[in-house]
Regions:
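Residue-level signal for beta-strand positions within conserved beta-sheet cores that form or flank
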Residues: 130
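Left-handed beta-helix
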Residues: 1-91, 96-115, 122-123, 127, ...
């Protein structure tokens, strides 16, 4: 509840809520810069990231683990890759996943899961006509988006 505020600016997005007086003296760019200096991760990273194969949403980030929701579009797949610093655990919550792990293929349906150890070559593919949803739990000392060594990529990324 707000009392005695005649004019407010209210901006609501999926990952943030801004409520401020409609005052010409307030500099939004400067406020965001100040949040960046304090290492506020909401300023640095948007929770939903789009990729050629679909998207992922960061649900939770802590020091040694991170939880993401992956959406793999129909007939798409991620690159064949491995990670130097993290392990992953995938849980299928919607659809069917075709997972490659160290040259072996696993077909997973809803409520099935698989562990991807650090250093294992892996890929997930959605061969279906509907989106595939996976919850990914990453664990490790370093959880970096650029911790990817690609071996094959249909989208020609390095």
């Amino acid at each position: 509840m707000v009392i005695n505020k005649k004019y407010l600016i209210i901006i609501s997005t999926k990952d943030a809520l801004l409520v401020m007086p409609n005052d010409k003296n307030i500099n939004i760019k400067e406020s965001i810069k100040n949040l960046s200096k304090k290492n506020n991760e909401k300023v640095q990273y948007h929770p939903t990231v789009y990729r050629p194969w679909g998207s992922f949403e960061i649900l939770l980030t802590k020091k040694n683990y991170q939880v993401k929701k992956l959406i793999i579009n129909p007939k798409q797949k991620i690159s064949l890759q491995k990670h130097k610093y993290r392990s992953e655990h995938w849980i299928v919550v919607k659809g069917r996943a075709c997972v490659t792990k160290n040259n072996k293929t696993y077909n997973l349906k809803k409520n099935h899961s698989i562990d991807i150890p650090k250093g294992a070559k892996h890929r997930v593919e959605n061969k279906e006509k509907t989106p595939l949803t996976i919850i990914e739990i990453q664990t490790g000392d370093k959880l970096l988006e650029n911790d990817i060594i690609r071996f094959e990529d249909v989208y020609n990324r390095n």
